[in-house]
Amino acid sequence: MITKSFLIAMSTLLLTACPDSNRTHAQQKPAAPVTVKPAPAKPAPKDASAKPADKDAAIITSIIKDSEAYYKELCKDASVSKEERRSKLILHIARKFLGTPYVAKTLETKGKERLVINARQLDCTTYVENTMAIYLCVSNGQTSYDNYKNQLRLLRYANGEVAYAARQHYFTQWIEENTKKGYVHELQSPTPPFTAEQLLRIDFMTTHVSLYPMLKDSPDDIKTIAQRERELSGRRYRYIPKTSIRNNSLFRSTIKDGDIIAITTSKKGLDTSHIGIAVWHKDGLHMLNASQIHKKVVEEPMTLYQYMQRHPSQTGIRIVRMK
């Protein structure tokens, strides 16, 4: 006869054999494969034997399907403007990645450059790229996984060419190339709140080659990137000083939910040091971003103004809008 005490003992044994499988957010070690749960969409399958590429495909496909359904409902509402649909869809997609571990340099691979798709681990740039690639797919009705891969390639590389030197390492180049492709435009105005001007002096990569393993042993790539740095240097861009960021009608009418925030920097040789996605709360402008501080994708609890005051080298923000 199976007694009650026997059943309790077996239950305890099974629980002991199944430890908690929650994701880790440690930055120093490679993050374990995880599954983003984009509620209310069905979560990606938790198959421990699945390859990372299969998990990435499952995550992206799940987010695309959920976002496609969300967008169709938005389009049925005649009271929602085209601009509001864009903002709402971008935020909807961006929030699907909340909690995803922050891992730097996931695009750096051994050997030849390839199109890296990693939805399990994100840095600030890959977070924005993945969000915007999915946005472009859904808003244009091209929602297959192959459509997504193609869109990501076009966003990430100059002329869509998968090569290390063609990857848009400087965000100013990313803006420029994707403006040419018709995906984005940068807000540039001589009037407030764009009251400051950034003069570019770009040379960080070629003066810090040792920081880039895929670059240091490639003289041709160094030469190509040095040429691109020279082309970017000397350009001037309007930006909003961090001390000027406010929660008022001017800022709310200028910066929209879903805009890309590019944080300008005083660090020598760089144009920007961090990027994220704008989101307004009652207390002011906040930022969705893959955070090195929080070690995951977060909707920053501090306002952007408060956040930037804690980073002395951050000077202000440039604003880029998806089309």
Predicted regions and their residues:
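Short alpha-helix capping/helix-loop boundary micro-motifs
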Residues: 239-251, 265
